[in-house]
Amino acid sequence: MLGFGRRRLFSALLQVQKRPCQPSRNMRLVQFQAPHLEEPHLGLESGVGGGVVDLNAFDSTLPKTMVQFLEQGETTLSVARRALATQLPVIPRSQVTFLAPVTRPDKVICVGLNYADHCQEQNVRVPKSPIIFSKFSSSIVGPYDEIILPPESKEVDWEVEMAVVIGKKGKHIKATDVMAHVAGFTVAHDVSARDWQMRNGKQWLLGKTFDTFCPLGPALVTKDTIADPHNLKICCRVNGEVVQSSNTNQMVFKTEYLIAWVSQFVTLYPGDLLLTGTPPGVGMFRKPPVFLKKGDEVQCEIEELGVIINKVV
């Protein structure tokens, strides 16, 4: 399994100790903070669980948010590729705080019942077309941030998901053209208040969009890095126990179909997120049902993408 990293609090160090190191050949874009920086920067994660190369230090003309970086397309990606090929100082992982790789996107689009084995555990039919809902972008937090249990809910559940990050604006995108509009992939946790999914006329939004209900990260792994995003192991652990374990090959509707479908209705913008559904093993379908409680630790992991670890408070 992939190695696990943990969020580090800011230290009292006055200067960041850096060591030269060749970054990973795979492009793993991150947003991060460090004690010596006045504001968040963009960086390259030096492999899963590795330190960070500061892209803004490499080229001060680069934007400092991922959405702006993606909006500039090939211009900024070419700079990141140059940095990837250069031996640059790496800030140790212990000295950085990872933010969500994308913050405040225009849209967070989600897909329900998109794993065949998840449909089986509910004894429901596989959908004939995608079931689309959303989360507000205010629900996004970093890969090692805390999940806050809202006092309004007693049934907060886990859902590991692969998220697709849009890299190019598009509307009415053909399935054959979809990947030209995709920047890459990341790990998402679609935290869900089941009781609120069943209220409010059974509109799912309120149950999905409490603050901190969308941990994301640790990196935006560019599409050229992943040989087949629809053949990746995906799992979730609660307090070390595996509760979800499947493969993205179980998706009913793959990335190309989903984005083509959604783009019929809305224009997609750089930084938009598409959460592609969760596999079986969620708490509400256990007998008896199990829900998250204070003190729990949830690890969501996807092969090649990494792991996010969030404590419940």
UniProtKB/Swiss-Prot annotation:
Q: Which reaction does it catalyse?
A: oxaloacetate = enol-oxaloacetate
Concerning PANTHER family, the annotation shows: FUMARYLACETOACETATE HYDROLASE DOMAIN-CONTAINING PROTEIN 2A, FUMARYLACETOACETATE HYDROLASE DOMAIN-CONTAINING PROTEIN 2A-RELATED
Q: Where is the transit peptide?
A: 1-84
What this protein is called in its record is Oxaloacetate tautomerase Fahd2a, mitochondrial
Q: InterPro entries under this entry?
A: FAH, Fumarylacetoacetase-like_C, Fumarylacetoacetase_C_sf
Q: Which SUPFAM superfamilies match?
A: FAH
Q: Where in the cell is it found?
A: Mitochondrion
- Which GO terms of type biological process are on file? oxaloacetate metabolic process
High-level lineage: Eukaryota, Metazoa, Chordata, Craniata, Vertebrata
Q: Which organism is it from?
A: Mus musculus (Mouse)
User: Might you give the EC number(s) for this enzyme?
Assistant: 5.3.2.2
